[in-house]
Amino acid sequence: MSMFCYQCQEAAGCKGCTVRGVCGKTEDVAKSQDLLIYILKGISVYGVKGREVGVINKEVDNFMVEGLFATITNANFDREVFIERIKRGLQLRQELKEQVIKAGGNVENSHANKNWLDKMLSFVGLKKEEETKLPDAATWFADNVEEFNAKAEKVGVLATKDEDIRSLRELITYGIKGLAAYVEHAHNLNFDNEEIHGFMHKALAATLDDTLTVDDLVALTLETGKYGVEGMALLDKANTQTYGNPEITKVNIGVRNNPGILISGHDLRDLEQLLEQTKGTGVDVYTHSEMLPAHYYPAFKKYSHFAGNYGNAWWKQTEEFEKFNGPILMTTNCLVPPKDSYKDRVYTTGVVGFPGLKHIDADEKGEKDFSSIIEHAKKCAAPTEIEKGEIVGGFAHNQVFQLADKVVEAVKTGAIKRFFVMAGCDGRAKSRNYYTEFAQKLPKDTVILTAGCAKYKYNKLNLGDIGGIPRVLDAGQCNDSYSLALIALKLKEVFELEDINELPISYNIAWYEQKAVIVLLALLHLGVKNIHLGPTLPAFLSPNVANVLVENFGIGGITNVEDDMKMFLG
């Protein structure tokens, strides 16, 4: 059986990748990821049972988060990494099972009739006692790659035959993957939330439960959104308490004459360590793609060698990494399989991986030694300039709340007629040029609220301002969509509205991978309706599941700029 993956927006033919991922993922990597997810779901069965008797294994919880994060689109392409995670996952599953048994938990086959009356009726033959077996994912074991390969053929997405059940199971799983990314970043800053871990176990274990109906899974999907909000709140707290609240900042997009290191991804703790270790070395540090918003945090402004942002969204890296000349550090997704011409300059860390690239691990305390990449940088030429100028950002919730009076007055006077939330992801599809054209053609009395790398479609267009308020307000990384939600809730409060959907806010969101999925589910949990997703709707939404989202939440796609503009503006 060939691979099957449809977790991202680039799913081939908007159906699924079956030979090789459009992302560059090979068939053997895809299947090893399938098996790892299967093992993680099996661990979650014991994670749920453990919590029933007070057993919480933090090593297991962290392993779950890292494993889920590693399977996100464009994070890790190294099959050997997944094989090792599968082996370790099986070990941890057994260890957790033994801990649950020791605590008095029931880890064997359970019975549906648990109360005393049912048991008595069953004993006298008046009621059948149904045995519910542990799912195979909680019991299957192997210790060699041959058996791993054989099992991986049987446990992929298509193992669930019912199209709607499959669709909802995958929607939940992808949401949990996105949530795992945010939890991992918070964990790296020593912030955690046990309740979120507990829910992740519950949700993943539920995807193995064949007794759950479509309605059950729809409810669980919305509950996933609830924990998406909590996960983004946790990361917002971690980032702001560690580095301060983002503030309005001009970021240089040109270059200096020193050699440099380009840091990409999302992990601010990695950036902090790199900046500390490059002090006084003569090596500058530049951000790339989703690392741009790091410039908005006060704590990073003390580094004189924090030079600016180089390049654009992740998908342009094959040409931009070539021109940067120095080494690149990938802290998280999105990694594109590198060209041979610059492959020796790419370093990975955290959950990122690609065969042949140099990987930098953390020690037991979470500290990383970046001396090798710094020494590499010293031998390289300064970056080739690809653009000049500045871009402005830093409009997260705290900063916007400080401007609240100005914003509210602009709305009341009609200077601002409508806000457009255009958060989300960028990607290589030409159809995404829609978002550039859409931004250009928006009326001058509208303001764009953005977060995530979708901003690169319009953050350099110089769209002007309204009474000193920039028409593009960049809150930060994709997880900072949380700020956009808080801003909307604040406006609802200020204008004394009962429903968030009464606000003059439209949602035209570009999605790409699984973090966008958890952001979407979080918005649905908050009651936001009439969200439009593009450039295509997710391939993993079956017609019936898509219809549920349309009927209950007004989810829609996009068509063309002219027609959509009329639709949004009425």
UniProtKB/Swiss-Prot annotation:
Binds 1 [4Fe-4S] cluster. One of its GO terms (molecular function) is peroxidase activity. It is found in: Cytoplasm. One of its GO terms (cellular component) is cytoplasm. Its cofactor is [4Fe-4S] cluster; hybrid [4Fe-2O-2S] cluster. The keyword Transmembrane helix does not apply. Disulfide bonds: none annotated. Transmembrane segments: none annotated. The modification Cysteine persulfide is found at C425. Its EC number is 1.7.99.1. Hybrid [4Fe-2O-2S] cluster binds at H266, E290, C334, C425, C453, C478, E513, K515. It is an enzyme of class 1 (oxidoreductase). Keywords: 4Fe-4S, Cytoplasm, Iron, Iron-sulfur, Metal-binding, Oxidoreductase. Its main location: cytoplasm. It catalyses: A + NH4(+) + H2O = hydroxylamine + AH2 + H(+). It comes from the Bacteria. One of its GO terms (biological process) is response to hydrogen peroxide. SUPFAM superfamilies: Prismane protein-like (SSF56821). Coiled coil: none annotated. Catalyzes the reduction of hydroxylamine to form NH(3) and H(2)O. PANTHER family: HYDROXYLAMINE REDUCTASE. Belongs to the HCP family. NCBIfam families: hybrid_clust (TIGR01703), PRK05290.1 (NF003658). This is Hydroxylamine reductase. It comes from Clostridium tetani (strain Massachusetts / E88). The lineage of its organism: Bacteria, Bacillati, Bacillota, Clostridia, Eubacteriales. The gene is hcp.
